[in-house]
């Protein structure tokens, strides 16, 4: 801590190869700290060098390193061409809505700076698909600056499918566990039911069942897992509950 110069000396001298570093993911934590310290000192080119020479190839640290490298390139070096490759690497190596919207938004910013309006709008629209995230909302404001946004309506489950769902023995078991105050054991059953037929609404039915027995936490879990695969059940992911008495 506080030894930026001595740390920098080490980071600039060592070989930036995976074989040499052995665990470049462990080195990244220090690189991140030093890079941010250098930004504070307005040493932007050195900060970019430290961030981008990470020797990572995959994993969350790789994604984080690529985003930071792109951010420094775009925001401080004013080099959108350099930033573009980093943001693309980030976007292609993440899967959660919060990260996908982040990558899409910054790609939109990058193409905007390059003067490529169509590409910029394309990425902002991609980011705006994730309206429950910060960058999703920023993306929406870029594409539709004067329009309010609404979360997508919940898909409607076929009435016959819903009727058959509630006839299942496992569903009856969930209600029984609730009556016996043993609803904590229903978590994995609900997860199983949610995975039965996702395209036909099994996740929605499982989340509703969890809500029926006041296990909003289980409903959120089902909905959040679905959101990782770009199926958004916002009614259950962000429930409105009564104030406890």
Regions found by a protein language model. Give the residues of each.
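Cell-wall glycan-active module
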Residues: 1-245
């Amino acid at each position: 801590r506080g030894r930026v110069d001595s740390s920098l000396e080490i980071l600039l001298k060592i070989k930036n190869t995976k074989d040499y570093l052995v665990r470049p993911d462990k080195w990244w934590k220090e690189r991140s700290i030093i890079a941010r310290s250098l930004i504070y000192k307005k040493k932007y080119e050195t900060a970019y060098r430290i961030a981008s020479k990470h020797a990572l190839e995959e994993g969350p640290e790789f994604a984080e390193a690529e985003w930071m490298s792109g951010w420094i390139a775009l925001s401080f070096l004013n080099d959108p061409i350099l930033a573009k490759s980093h943001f693309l690497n980030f976007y292609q190596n993440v899967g959660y809505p919060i990260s996908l919207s982040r990558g899409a938004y910054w790609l939109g910013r990058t193409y905007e700076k390059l003067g490529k309006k169509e590409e910029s709008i394309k990425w902002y629209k991609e980011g705006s698909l994730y309206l429950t995230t910060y960058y999703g909302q920023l993306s929406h404001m870029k594409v539709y600056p004067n329009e309010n946004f609404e979360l997508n309506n919940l898909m409607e489950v076929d009435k016959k499918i819903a009727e058959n769902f509630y006839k299942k023995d496992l569903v009856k078991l969930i209600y029984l566990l609730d009556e016996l105050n043993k609803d904590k054991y229903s978590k994995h059953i609900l997860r199983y039911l949610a995975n039965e037929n996702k395209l036909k609404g099994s996740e929605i039915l499982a989340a509703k069942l969890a809500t029926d027995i006041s296990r909003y936490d289980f409903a959120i879990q089902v909905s959040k897992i679905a959101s990782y695969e770009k199926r958004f059940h916002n009614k259950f992911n962000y429930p409105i509950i009564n104030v406890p008495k």
